[in-house]
Amino acid sequence: MLGALQIETRRVGKNLTMEAETTPPSAELKSLWNHQKEMSERLTDKAALISTKELHRAVMLVMADRLKATIDRDADLMYHSCEDYIADLKVVQRSLAEANAKRSAYGPLQDLIWQAETFGFHMVEMEFRQHSVVHSRALEDIREHGLHGERGELQPMTHEVLDTFRALGSIQKRNGIKAARRYIISFTKSAQNIRDVYELNRLAFSHPKDVPTIDVIPLFEQLEDLQNSVDVLEEMIKIPEVQARLKATGGKMEVMLGYSDSSKDAGPTSATLALHSAQERIAKWAESHDIDLTLFHGRGGAVGRGGGPANRAVLAQPVGSVKCRFKLTEQGEVIFARYGNPALAIRHVESVAAATLLQSAPSVEKRNTDMTAKYADMANKLDEAAHNRFLDLLNTDGFAPWFSTVTPLTEIGLLPIGSRPAKRGLGAKSLDDLRTIPWIFSWAQARINLAAWYGLGTACEQFGDLNTLRQAYEEWPLFSTFI
């Protein structure tokens, strides 16, 4: 990314050929030029030789050379943050605008500023993710044996956890905080899970930090966790490190919701309704605390993992949960289908972006709120019936061995696909220990799409009012999207 910015900065700068007589540089630009000269007369002399009387161009050429120094890790000349680079670009832009060269100020130069603001020096942000139990076990290991193994050898997993935080810190040091600042906790159960991560981050560097530079993101996955999410968040914002991050980010907070495990845990119908309810409650909670919330949707590609048309899913979100922002995972099995062709990729992104803007319109928010209230009783009845039916299946005697027999579960577990093992722990014996991907894929390979619908038919049949179901399908986006 730095190389691309360097090339573009030089290209934009070379086109700023206006002389000082026709486009007088501002005092702010002259001050920036003097600062560059103090930093390196070699660079300013080279730029001045090329750009006699063209100060806007000369400043941009020095900026391009400083980006090259950033790539080379030249501590004396490098930009230490993308924000400093953007600030210099805006000095040039303001100078051009004040000189009435607005086409130059808001043309390719503006595009360059947008690129830098969007991608930074790192282009793509790296996110880290680990199971909450791994953190708690690592802390137990450290308390028992000492941080440096004073009382016995630490477990390999503990070393891996500490090394992960050190790697995160190294990435931030080299590429800026925004390059790697999000740490997701799978299976968040309580606020203690968040405390564990900040404690491990502190221990990894063997010294306390004044203000932490990572945002810990709780991931609520199972039905009970979704139901308790607001209580956990209420305790979470009392943690000093979380308060420090909220202050540092201007009140921004991210919360992730898991579609896959909630579906496996409660069945597709109950999971859909529980996720919708959780989003609604979390959005209201965030608003009450003046928190700028982003909900991160951990949707899979398969319908049983929350998959389906993303634009329709956006339009079905509850009021206050989008606010012109929609973050979601794109699973490996759908990446080629959505992004393998440039035309399809553009169409998909435009479709989701349009839905995100439309969902934030007052009329759409009001419709979703009204329809959720109108069909709340129906939803509760469908939820109870579908959940009971799904649990009846899972609790049927002999279901687990039958599932292993009629589907290629064992073989899928051996495939070198995915970023995590098929089961949680080497001794996993039950369906509870089975990860969602092999659960979904095993059904799919047996040509049984059970994970996407099981329990819904029974729930609709027990509800009995076909006219109400049809009306809900026409009026309530959540219900029609699910169907």
What are these model-predicted stretches?
Residues 11-174, 463-483:
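Extended, charge-enriched "interface" segments that sit outside catalytic cores
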Residues 122, 127-129, 134-136, 146-153, ...:
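Acidic, glycine-enriched catalytic cores built around paired aspartates
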Residues 2-16, 21, 204-382:
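Catalytic or ion-translocation cores adjacent to nucleophile or general acid/base/metal-coordination motifs
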Residues 51-52, 59, 118-199, 203-207, ...:
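Active-site cores of enzymes that catalyze phosphoryl transfer or operate on phosphate-rich substrates
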Residues 93-97, 183-186, 216-219, 296:
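Short glycine-rich or small-residue beta-strand-to-loop segments that form or flank ligand, phosphate
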